[in-house]
Structures are given as structure tokens and as C-alpha cells.
Amino acid sequence: MSKSKNSWDIRGKHFILPAIFLVIFMTIAITLWLMKDNVFYLFNFSFIGISLAIGMLLTGILPKKIKYRGRLVTQFLVGSYMVIFLGILGRENMQIEGFFFYLFMGVFIGATIHYLIAKIGGTFIFGRGWCGYACWTVAILDLLPWKKPREGRIPYLSAFRYVHFFGSLGLVIYVMYVLKDRPELESLRELSWFLIGNLIYYVVGFLLAYFLKDNRAICKYLCPIPVLQKVGSRFSILKINIKQDKCVECFACERECPMDIKLLDYMYKGKRVLSTECISCMTCVYVCPTDAVEYTAGFDGGFKEYLRYYGEPVALKKNRKPISNSQKKIVETLEK
């Protein structure tokens, strides 16, 4: 193992993004606390902001071989807080059905705030960063051994995400407006709905990961949350960018991408990665041997999705440009 893969990377640039996110969440925490006169908002958003900052910082400074552990720290901190404190102890239904129930009832509690800020409004800033850094379902599934999908996406199977989303919405409308059954807040019924729903997610998520050999299969094919996130993430301020003058087209980023995005296709078009499937996990940033991949702020948007589907090779060496001897050595090492 090379020294670089064992070395900590204590460079100033790795402290910038964690600091920005910490400031954003602390601002939200203090603002809502003062507006609502409720200390819950101060604790809630401060904890989430600190957890995100810790995970992002660790992801940046840890040795390359274990950078993924930084993201796991945030996933477990935020995920356990949401599940244990809000879901189990607070008896709030943090599933999407709970959000629909509370929204139609006009109730502004933890679950409502979580969806409106993290999964809808926040996507205009950090895209689907929730999925990459805070989802409690994938916090467990990411411990499975299939981090790098090999076969590509199954065409049209992602349509089930929309079936799930509108099915959940229809179920809530039916229960509330046809059966006239309004859930009681912080009840055992809400807790049961939350626990049973999560159990189903974990079982189905594990089965999909096992049979498709892809930890993120449930994200791609069944989870309804991306339906909420897609509009905002298309126009998010923070996105992945690949600097063409530094890229040697080794395709390490595409080989490691857990969401099967053809990252270099965006580079060839002179654009940042506009795919709504990007979860801002930063894997591509930290596997790049030439530091060509970066997480940048800007204003753009687009609707073209460049994704790798079943049967396509992990990477095509198209448009390879002449590279220096030192860059060739890097590519040869990666391709062994």
C-alpha cells in the first residue's frame, strides 16, 4: 500500500466545506429558535450541522483507503438521532407517509421540518446530499460489501420510485379523506407505522443489494424520496465539477461511483455534473489521482442524465487525449 493511501491529508481546503455547512445549519438553528421560541430547533439543527461538519472533515482528511468512514460517521450520527430521538422517543412517523399526514394536517413538527428543509428546500443548495450523508436506511446498507456496482442500472426499474411515491400519497389521502381517519400525534400507532415501515425498507434494501450486488439498489429503484429531490437537485448550487485540463481519463471516478453516473460525459460537454442521481458522496473527488474532480458552487441546471445501464462497460476510453509520461504511469497503475 502506498504512503499516500496511508497518510492523513491535513490541508486547509478540507476545512472549508465543513465550515460552510456548519454555519448554514447553525444559522437555521438560531433563526428558528428565536422565531419559534422553542429550544428544540436550536438543538436539532445544531446537532445535524455539527454531525455533517464532522463527517465531511473526516472524509477529507482521512487516508484514502478509509475516507468512506467519515461519511459513515455522519450517517450514523444523523440517522440514529432521527430514528431514536425523533422516531422512537418522539413517536413521530419519519417515513414519507408521516410527512404527508402532517402536511395535510398543517402540523409543523420534526418530520415536517426535516422533509421541507433537508429533502426539498435543501436540494437547491446541496442536491441529494441527504442521501449521501444522512440517510439512516443506507447507513446500514453501506456496510454491505457491494459498494461499487458492476452491472450498471436496470433500465426502467427506477419507475417504481414513482409508483412508491404516488402510492404512498394516495394511501394517505384515502385514509384521511375517505376513511376520515386522522392520526393522533405522538401515538403508539405513529410509532408502529414508523418501525414497520423502516423494517420493510431494511429487508427490501438488503434483498435488492444482495441479488443485484449493489448497496444503493434501493436508492435507484424503490426509494420515493428522490422524486421530491429531483427538481431542486437539477439546479443545486453545489455540484461535482471535473477540470478537463487536469483529467487524464483514467475513469477512476466512474468506476467508483455508487450511482452509475457517466461523470466524464458532463466534462466532455463542458458542464458540471448535472445528474439528479448524484448523492454528493464525494467518492469521485477522493479517488481522483490528479485532483481533477472537485465540489464547486455555481448556478446552472440541466435535464440530461448520463447514466450507465446494464450491459455497458464500467468506462469507455473515448476521447482520450495525449497525456504526459507521469500521467501515463498513474493511469497504468489504476488500470492494473
What residue spans do the PLM features occupy?
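Non-ligating segments of multi-cofactor redox enzymes
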Residues: 1-267, 276, 286, 291-336
